[in-house]
């Protein structure tokens, strides 16, 4: 692993850890202040909502200005968001903090992923780079909430918010040492493109579609497994262990991917992940014991954890270099919009047909969608 890649992983992890820690601390503070679960749900949604609207502009900005300037502005926004919560820990300010830290994290990730993709020289390197880079969020989703939780219990909410404000500053210390790549010049005579023009490419649409299918399956596990565990009388620690087993498996498979990247084909891995995910979602609600459900969660984590690096590798291969930022931004916009809306649909479906019905419906849906991944095979040949 190169020094440059280590800096990128560190930068992405620290900014993401700030948002992950705020996503734990801000709702807890709101609950302590007596706000309803509905208000807390709105607060949590704000972390993703900003990314939906900022993803495309952030991608275009990264295409024009490279790595360091977008990350610098993201660091300022994230540190300001967490810092405001430390100074005025009241609900309206917490909402502003959620918007700032969520948007800043999304913008910095787009710039970092674009830079990492440009630095890779071959398709194998692309798969390796994005596999290593995908480890960062898996680590920060543990590190940020862990530090925030310790500080809340030991020193209070203000200390936790202040610590989260320091993490983006550490990101900038890492990014200052990164090497800025030469700017990509738009081909002369080409009209200024619109982001939606990318969707005219059939392969691009298919890659986004399979990413959306599998991202929705990730959301099913995150939001529906706790409901299923509650129905069966599992304790909070058991439900947390199920979610933790899934996250650890998703992270560990990303450690393995760089070592075998040369032997993998993106379309084949994505197709296999969709088949495995559909089958596992069909089985999951039939399992009755925590041990069996935990094993199924691990297998789901392995299947879904290997998808993002392959999707990012394909996006960078099929998109013009001067539009990599837009492509990454468009992908993030789709995924974040899904993360905002899909839990609402799952909740409505669960009330109508039951939790098991949600698993089975999404399992059939993703199995049917696997045909899109199979068609990527022909796209890679052409």
What is the meaning of each model-derived region?
Residues 69-83, 165, 268-283:
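Structural signature of the two symmetry-related core transmembrane helices
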Residues 165-184, 369-377:
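C-terminal membrane-cytosol helix-exit motif in multi-pass small-molecule transporters
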Residues 54-66, 152, 253-265, 350:
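Helix-to-loop junctions at the C-terminal end of transmembrane segments
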Residues 92-100, 291-299:
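Paired small-residue
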Residues 1-2, 180-208:
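Juxtamembrane intracellular "pre-TM" segments in multi-pass secondary transporters
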Residues 99-136:
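Cytoplasmic helix-loop-helix junction between adjacent transmembrane helices
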Residues 48-56, 141-142, 247-255, 339-340:
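Residue-level signature of mid-helix packing/kink "hotspots" within the transmembrane helices
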Residues 2-48, 205-210, 215-232:
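Helix-loop boundary and gating motifs at the non-cytosolic
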